[in-house]
């Protein structure tokens, strides 16, 4: 399988997806036809989100079509070379994808050679479940099970920092809560600017910041770029 799982879409001082474009280019391998899954978009319309994505990917020669605009979406997924899943609200993304019957076809197509690119919520969707999203559950997705393309849980936008005077839980504390009720899970705290690339069965960590791995009953483990899962 070929996956590019990004913590986020924007870095300070850079244009939207600018840091990700070289990574995408390196994994295309001649692929050009892409379907875009815009359902995580809430405060922007799916048309706006699709057009924005298509414009930024034009320099890479990628032809982007929004899945919501296609009369036969399952056929489009079957024919796609690239499946791109944008960030936003993970609960809405999963709900719409499930109700439209897209989850199994997407997973099957990626397992048979399509490149999967997802940022933030799109990275969450590639995991076994969406239980490590940071998003508010604005809709009921009728279950948390997701694509299961990547075997570990990802927490995108990971930071353990708290504003001065803030008394809420740290991100690690929230992850530890999950590991109490689901100790079988392994959670990757993927900070902004970092990513995971999967190719030929090998997952490699990239990015300038320290990534953290959390397991039940164990201390967090720090990982740096180049680590192979």
UniProtKB/Swiss-Prot annotation:
Domain of life: Bacteria
Keywords linked to the UniProt accession: Cytoplasm, Dipeptidase, Hydrolase, Protease, Serine protease
Record's catalysed reaction(s): Dipeptidase E catalyzes the hydrolysis of dipeptides Asp-|-Xaa. It does not act on peptides with N-terminal Glu, Asn or Gln, nor does it cleave isoaspartyl peptides
Gene3D superfamilies reported for this sequence: 3.40.50.880
Record-level Gene Ontology MF annotations: dipeptidase activity; serine-type peptidase activity
Main enzyme class: hydrolase
Similarity annotation: Belongs to the peptidase S51 family.
Stored NCBIfam families: PRK05282.1
Protein name: Peptidase E
Organism field: Salmonella arizonae (strain ATCC BAA-731 / CDC346-86 / RSK2980)
Source taxonomy: Bacteria, Pseudomonadati, Pseudomonadota, Gammaproteobacteria, Enterobacterales
């Amino acid at each position: 399988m070929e996956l590019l799982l990004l913590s986020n879409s924007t870095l300070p001082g850079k244009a939207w997806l600018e840091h990700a474009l070289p990574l995408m280019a390196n994994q295309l391998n001649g692929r050009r036809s892409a379907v875009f899954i815009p359902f995580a978009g809430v405060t922007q319309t799916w048309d706006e989100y699709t057009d924005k994505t298509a414009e930024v990917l034009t320099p890479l020669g990628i032809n982007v079509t929004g899945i919501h605009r296609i009369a036969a979406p399952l056929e489009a997924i079957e024919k796609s070379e690239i499946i791109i899943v944008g960030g936003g609200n993970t609960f809405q993304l999963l709900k719409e994808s499930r109700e439209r019957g897209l989850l199994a076809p997407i997973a099957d197509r990626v397992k048979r050679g399509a490149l999967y690119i997802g940022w933030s919520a799109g990275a969450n969707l590639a995991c076994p479940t969406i239980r490590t999203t940071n998003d508010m559950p604005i809709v009921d997705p009728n279950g948390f099970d997701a694509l299961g393309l990547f075997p570990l849980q990802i927490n995108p936008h990971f930071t353990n920092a708290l504003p001065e005077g803030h008394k809420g839980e740290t991100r690690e504390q929230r992850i530890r809560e999950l590991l109490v009720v689901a100790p079988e899970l392994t959670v990757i705290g993927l900070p902004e600017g970092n990513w995971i690339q999967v190719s030929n069965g090998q997952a490699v960590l990239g990015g300038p910041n320290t990534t953290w791995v959390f397991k039940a009953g164990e201390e967090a483990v720090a990982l740096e770029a180049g680590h192979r899962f």
